Amino acid sequence: MSAKNLQEVLDQAGGTVDLLRNSQLGAYIYPVVPAEFTNFRREVIAWRESAVLFDQSHHMVNLFISGRDALKLITDNGINSTAKFAVDTAKQFVPVSPEGGVIGDGILFRLAEDQFVYVGRAPVANYLQFRATQGYDVDIKLDQRSPMRPYGKAVTRDLWRFQIQGPRAWEVIEKLHGGTVEQTRFFTLGHMKIEIGRASCRERV
């Protein structure tokens, strides 16, 4: 008999551990980026004691939303308040259907008064594109996640996203910048300059 809810799924499997350990789903493939550059142990030690660079450019979609109704589209379709959503900040965004069903979640950045970018999984981007056709004055641009298996073909993104993490991360950031960089607060954006151009700096705890 098939399970009707999560508790029945857990009961039939014998518990959470057995359910996850014996899952028939394959491993999630992060596109383009190798699983390890040296080995897992050395990379975890570096993460704990110095600094590591994560390439997070490829596994999420970017949905660019702009126009006079951009904020209205977001406000009408999400459970989050946008009353204090300032430019150069970000927030967790959770859109829901008119009936209240959760579509998914992701990170929403406010780049200008009428310019936003959603970063996350495809279902939310698909839903926002659908809702945008229902009377909103907005422009939408979708930057799909990178293919899991590019088969040697060049992979490009509209945005490249990197995470520097570890106790010496800020040293790395300031060395790249060539001077002091103002510390950012939770989900706020700052800017730094590196030789190849301009980068945004965001703190997420």
Which residues make up each language-model segment?
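Acidic, proline/glycine-enriched N-terminal capping motif
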Residues: 1-96, 101
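Generic recognition of flexible, low-complexity loop/linker segments
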Residues: 48-51, 105-106, 204
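Short beta-strand-initiation
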Residues: 58-60, 90, 101-104, 113, ...
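Acidic, low-complexity central loop/insert segments
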Residues: 107-204
